[in-house]
Design a protein with these regions (language model features):
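Catalytic domains of carbohydrate-active enzymes that cleave complex glycans
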Residues: 1-76, 82-84, 133
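Short aromatic-acidic-glycine turn motif
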Residues: 96-109
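Short, exposed beta-strand/loop patches in secreted or surface proteins that constitute
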Residues: 65-69, 112-114, 123
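Feature targets compositionally biased, intrinsically disordered low-complexity regions
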Residues: 32, 40, 116-117, 172
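Beta-strand secondary-structure signal
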Residues: 76-78, 89-91, 122, 132-134
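C-terminal beta-strand-rich structural cap/linker in extracellular carbohydrate-active enzymes
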Residues: 117-173
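Short beta-strand and strand-turn-strand segments in soluble, beta-rich domains
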Residues: 106-118
Length: 174
């Protein structure tokens, strides 16, 4: 029996056969880069999103994102709030691991850039609204980490200590 047996519920591609929608394209358009399977398990994307109300990674409910254009030092991001009544807040991180420094943002509705100067950009978008953002960034300017906007990854868990080695020498032979 092999991993590609179509009758095996644990087959490698069973999720593709059961779901009429492939999520890879959606993730690429939302994050602004290829999926992790193309780069040794690491996401090389322009953005990552956090829901500040739920304190979790990902887009808030009823909020959509589309990375419309990518250039060497900037990207154009479109956010759409499909909720008819509620304003939505989102935290946009530069890169999957916060490795990109967001320098400034120019919303289509403004004539002057807003200086950011960090890896996070806080955005609030009204009900039934679309917001177009031109975001300038310095790529790979920050040390990558698993930090979230509300918790440092290093402080979240205890670090693993190495084993203590016995320094007693072992003599082999005479």
């Amino acid at each position: 029996e092999t991993m590609d047996d179509p009758n095996d519920p644990m087959a490698i591609h069973i999720w593709q056969e059961l779901s009429p929608m492939l999520l890879e394209g959606l993730a690429q358009l939302t994050l602004g880069g290829p999926m992790y399977i193309y780069h040794g398990g690491l996401m090389h994307v322009r953005f990552r999103y956090f829901d500040p109300v739920q304190k979790r990674p990902g887009l808030p409910t009823n909020l959509s994102a589309l990375v419309e254009r990518i250039e060497a030092d900037c990207a154009r991001l479109i956010l759409a709030n499909t909720d008819k009544l509620q304003t939505r807040d989102v935290i946009i991180q530069g890169g999957a691991f916060g490795e990109h420094q967001i320098l400034s943002v120019l919303p289509d509705s403004k004539t002057e850039r807003i200086t950011v100067g960090g890896k996070y950009l806080n955005v609030s978008i009204g009900p039934s609204s679309v917001l177009r953002l031109n975001i300038s960034m310095k790529r790979y300017a920050n040390d990558p980490s698993y930090d979230t906007p509300w918790e440092k990854a290093r402080e979240a868990v205890d670090l693993i200590s190495p084993r203590r080695h016995d320094t007693t020498a072992i003599k082999i032979g005479d």
